[in-house]
A protein has these predicted regions:
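Sec/Tat-exported extracytoplasmic proteins
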Residues: 45-50, 110-113
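Bacterial N-terminal signal peptides that target proteins for export
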Residues: 1-13
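Sec/Tat signal peptide C-region and signal peptidase I cleavage site
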Residues: 22-26
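Short N-terminal segments immediately surrounding and downstream of signal-peptide cleavage
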Residues: 27-45
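Beta-propeller fold detector
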Residues: 90, 167-168
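Bacterial N-terminal signal peptides
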Residues: 11-21
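Exposed beta-strand-loop-beta-strand "reactive/processing" segments of non-cytosolic proteins
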Residues: 50-78, 127-156, 162-163, 171-173
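Long, charged/polar, surface-exposed segments that mediate recognition or autoinhibition
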Residues: 82-120
Length: 174
């Protein structure tokens, strides 16, 4: 009997770990199921936006809806909290539109990696302990996707080139 209970406990722990891992990654989300405040913010901010990809995940205790979309020929992204607060807005830009100081920071991290898609990001709110907190002033950041030796990563730097988020190099999926 103790052996069966031990296995049951082990199975419960395993299932709990699977649940934790599953909930820490974003998952595709159907646009028709968006909470009304999120849908309203997106439609108001981007009336000509066409959603290409929509994911949802909990970040720092806040449900975030991550939109990848286009408006005309411009590729954009935005993160909107479940209460309808636009946390961040992103515009895909050419590499040469990144200011010199920011590009210097990107190149220092790249260390010979091939730089791909680049982004201009404006963050208006921080997420902390389940709360959406307005920043004193929006923060401008730049991101660059990179590849090297069969791996891909993304670096995010502040306008002055200081690394805000270092890349996590992961194998390129085929």
């Amino acid at each position: 009997m103790a052996r069966l209970t031990g296995r049951g406990g082990l199975i419960a722990v395993f299932l709990g770990l699977v649940l934790i891992v599953a909930t820490t990654h974003s998952a595709p989300f159907p646009p028709e199921k968006l909470p009304e405040p999120v849908a309203t913010t997106f439609k108001t901010a981007f009336p000509n936006g066409t959603i290409d990809k929509l994911d949802a995940e909990e970040e720092d205790g806040v449900m975030i809806y991550d939109f990848e979309f286009h408006a005309g020929d411009r590729q954009k992204e935005t993160d909107i909290a479940g209460d309808g607060t636009m946390v961040e807005s992103t515009l895909v830009i050419p590499r040469n539109d990144i200011p010199a100081a920011a590009m210097k920071g990107i190149l220092a991290v790249a260390k010979g990696a091939k730089i791909g898609r680049c982004e201009w990001m404006e963050t208006y709110y921080e997420l902390k302990d389940g709360k959406v907190i307005k920043m004193d002033k929006p923060m401008i950041k730049y991101a660059a996707e990179m590849t090297r030796k069969g791996k891909t990563g993304e670096v995010i730097v502040a306008a002055d080139g200081k690394v805000v988020e270092a890349p996590e190099w992961v194998p390129i999926s085929s």
